[in-house]
Amino acid sequence: MANRQQITLLKSSVARWNIWREGNPHIVPDFDRVDFNGINLSNANLRKANFEMALLNGANLQGANLTKAFFVGSDLRGANLSEADCQGMKLNDADLGGCIFWKSNLRSIDFSSRDLRDIDFSEADLRKADLRKSNLENVKFFKADLRKTLFTEANLTKAYLSSAWMQGTKLERANLSKAVLRYTLNLTPAQIQSAKIDRNTKVPQYLKIHWTSETDFHCEEKSR
């Protein structure tokens, strides 16, 4: 059950809240089903806090410490999680529509089989994150760190991956139709070959696509 004193303190002052948390590191904050719609919690220490089924529509969580926080079933539509530390967050069944994760730490997070359309992951750290079978249509991954990220069977239609770091990124059976991969770093022919692309997919300039039919292709590195 949510703690009323904790709710009042957090809503009144993030600065005082952070001081209280420093002095009470053993207490796990409980905000189960609390209405935080539109609240400004930027730079708040919310490590391991319980936000199950909480309402955070349009909340500002920029720079917040959200490591191992519990957001199962919460409403995070339109929330700003830019520069937040999100490692170990539990987001099962959370509504993330329109969220902003610019420069967020999402390393190893589980986003598999989720509807993440139109989300902004620009410059985020998604190393080893699991996005298998997720709907990532029109998602922005500009300059994101996608090393060893799992995109197996994901829908990346119209995704913007320009300048992303993709060494070891898993793309098996991912749909990259109309995706933008210009200036992507460390992308190999084998990675492209394992995915589905179309003639509107924009690959890096160091790769070349040879179409053998309407759907079949061969990818190779350009000779220098």
Language model feature labels by segment:
Residues 5-8, 15-16, 20-224:
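Tandem repeat scaffolds
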